[in-house]
Amino acid sequence: MHRVMTIRPDIPPQPDIAAPAEPPARVSPMMEQYHEIKAANPGLLLFYRMGDFYELFFEDAEIASRALGITLTKRGKHLGADIPMCGVPVERSDDYLHRLIALGHRVAVCEQTEDPAAARARKSVVRRDVVRLITPGTLTEDTLLDARANNYLMAIARTRGSAGVDRIGLAWIDISTGEFCVTECATGELSATLARINPNEAIVSDALYSDAELGPSLRELAAVTPLTRDVFDSATAERRLCDYFAVATMDGLAALSRLEAAAAAACVTYVDRTQLGKRPPLSPPAREAAGATMAIDPATRANLELTRTLGGERRGSLLDAIDCTVTAAGSRLLAQRLAAPLTDEAAIARRLDAVAAFVADSALREQIRSALRAAPDMARALARLSLGRGGPRDLASLRDGVSAADKVLAQLSQLAQPPHDIAAAMAALRRPSRDLCQELARALADDLPLLKRDGGFVRDGYEAALDETRKLRDASRLVVAAMQARYADETGVKGLKIRHNNVLGYFVEVTAQHGDRLMAPPLNATFIHRQTLAGQVRFTTAELGEIEAKIANAGDRALGLELDIFDRLAAMIDTAGDDLRAAAHAFALLDVATALAKLAVSDNYVRPEVDGSLAFAIEGGRHPVVEQALKRAGEPFIANACDLSPVPPPFPPPLAGEGRVGAGQIWLLTGPNMAGKSTFLRQNALIALLAQTGSFVPASRARIGIVDRLFSRVGAADDLARGRSTFMVEMVETATILNQATERALVILDEIGRGTATFDGLSIAWAAIEHLHEQNRCRALFATHYHELTALSAKLPRLFNATVRVKEWRGEVVFLHEVLPGSADRSYGIQVAKLAGLPPSVVARAKSVLAKLEANDRGQSARTLADDLPLFAMTARAPVEPPPPSEAEQLIEAVRALHPDELSPREALDALYALKAKLPKAD
């Protein structure tokens, strides 16, 4: 479900979003103020500050009450009807904001901008103003963000090309880190780009939002905001960008096309509006060249579960399996790389070189990882400080970051010739000023509050004026302590206490049994009764009032001086912002390199050979996610080879048991359900993706020619919202592959044609294979239960038949998970159905039907078959299933199936573990 917001300060409020302000005579001054502010911010939930709560009224209250599960009450009347109202405490507002933003809502935060006492003196309502617009794509607070994921705002612009060919300009920013990127693509590539970047919020023009072709897909985004066309005006784009970056021309910052500039300018314009003039520091727009990354369409990303499982969980995804990073920034960078594998051979090699350096030196790797654990999230701390939302702990984060940089540099100095990426990271870590770090260390106290308004974050001795003010404040408090002792002595009440709250200020508190003593002469002349509670009585004195004024003045002066120091330090940090951001990125880069090295060593990954050929040769390939799951269960993963190269590989065939390298760019894979066909398909796609990400891969050897597009058609799901059946979804995805796959593409197809009649499905699968072979000429893996398709290898020279090995023993199917040359003649569907728990009568009946089908011509009519086979009345007399083999018999059969002369040492060890797992469990 998506939400739509319109932020348009330049147009009148829309009556269906904000109720018009009532004439002053009909509403209270406070409600008149509310209507005025609400009308200026249509389409946003208005958090209206009233004391210690943010209140919501009218439709906003009803929406928030449903979304947050909080009580809906009422406050007065409006036009004769009750005013719906709900509220959230200010101190817990971040929790509620996080939930609203996650649901796609936008919020305007309206604060009190003067002291209520000043408003009372003016005999007027407290002044209030909107201080921030919070939208899904413009978050900076840690409490509202996922530390391990980027939070992107994307602008989408379109231009009408010649001959009706449209072009799309895209710009995306993360204001919490300063990242800013742009690119241009064809309309047909938009969905893949959106899936890769996965923006938290997209802004588009009204016209594009309503477009018949692109509008439906845009409205499927998590949050989309239509804006007026002038926001995307390319004629004013460069001027707006120059204004944001405070430069005379963009030539020295970025070379953008007119369309890219329009999208980039829309981004900074929207940021200006939502941040109310405060400008987060952004890097100059980085232009992403067309074809620089592997194109992966949305269906393929979902099917391969790259960053999220089909259920939407991170756990169980490829990212979860390979993420060994120790910093939030490193985790974000790894996710970025996984979403956008490179297609440039040299850039991939540079990443692999960095990983290899840490694979070769385990001691250095662990030293770096230990130091990185102390590196804070500097980029997000910088963004908060620049927007005035930072606190003392953000200052400390930057101090600690520079300190961690020195430790990392000292350890990296052990490398005699650091690879390119590591050398670049070292240079970036040297950039921040060490003088700034020392200044922060001198200024900040050891125990820091979360908020700067709490004070106490400046170290004693840093500034003389602050020290003097603190002494005056603290001395006044000592006077209060002495006064408490004197009052206790004068009244004879040993339990007398002097306390403080925001309502009474300083007051004297005694138990109820002593209250009458202070209210009786002569003590009542000194102690003025203020409040009686269940167990206590409270009093004030003139002397306490005088002391309170002195303490308050000293405390306010001390806090004011601390805030001045904070602003001074924040300004110093802002000046050094570019250097600090470079160091933050260097930490992330080193974290990813060391994390992938740790993964490679612990899970036995190898460095892939990635080149510009069309090769695809994998030995001993494994599925990275499934292998980890089996390892946790104490079971081995059966490795397999795959060769989709146009020529034989340059290295020897794999050892027996790992599978044998075939000779075909298209592999037709047959075998029963649950034998591992889908796992085999996916693992090869994931190995290619990991290799071009710059990671080592789960294999014993791998050579991969650059893959420019990755396609996956696996699994089955309908799309009822669009009126698409499961089969229709399958055909749409297959059509995308056949229309777009190039010779550099890698395609995996699973069970094409199964969602319709047998001969229809067989015909579609047949024609699809021929098209892949003759037209696309790409590398492909095609799994099927249509065994008739294996005959195509006789006429298609680059088609290779492969099968997943199984054994049948005493009516049971044993899955060996080995991929070998050849084809399967059976699918063992009934045996799998039996494993799934179908009733024995159904299994027996299915076997009898299958036997009849196999004994007769497959073209025999269903009516004849129905006449020949007795109905379910015969099921009761169905033969009894033979008992399953005992554990000892299964063990004997497994030993007989082994061929010791064909096993490598590693395979022999795996086989031994597998046999051990079959032993009866001890009681």
Swiss-Prot record:
One of its GO terms (biological process) is mismatch repair. The keyword Nucleotide-binding applies. GO terms for molecular function: ATP binding; ATP-dependent DNA damage sensor activity; damaged DNA binding; mismatched DNA binding. Signal peptide: none annotated. Belongs to the DNA mismatch repair MutS family. InterPro entries: DNA_mismatch_repair_MutS, DNA_mismatch_repair_MutS-lik_N, DNA_mismatch_repair_MutS/MSH, DNA_mismatch_repair_MutS_C, DNA_mismatch_repair_MutS_clamp, DNA_mismatch_repair_MutS_core, DNA_mismatch_repair_MutS_N, DNA_mismatch_repair_MutS_sf. HAMAP family: MutS. SUPFAM superfamilies: DNA repair protein MutS, domain I, DNA repair protein MutS, domain II, DNA repair protein MutS, domain III, P-loop containing nucleoside triphosphate hydrolases. This protein is involved in the repair of mismatches in DNA. It is possible that it carries out the mismatch recognition step. This protein has a weak ATPase activity. CDD domains: ABC_MutS1. The keyword DNA repair applies. PROSITE patterns: DNA_MISMATCH_REPAIR_2. This is DNA mismatch repair protein MutS. The gene is mutS. Coiled coil: none annotated. ATP binds at residues 671-678. GO terms for cellular component: cytosol. Keywords: ATP-binding, DNA damage, DNA repair, DNA-binding, Nucleotide-binding.
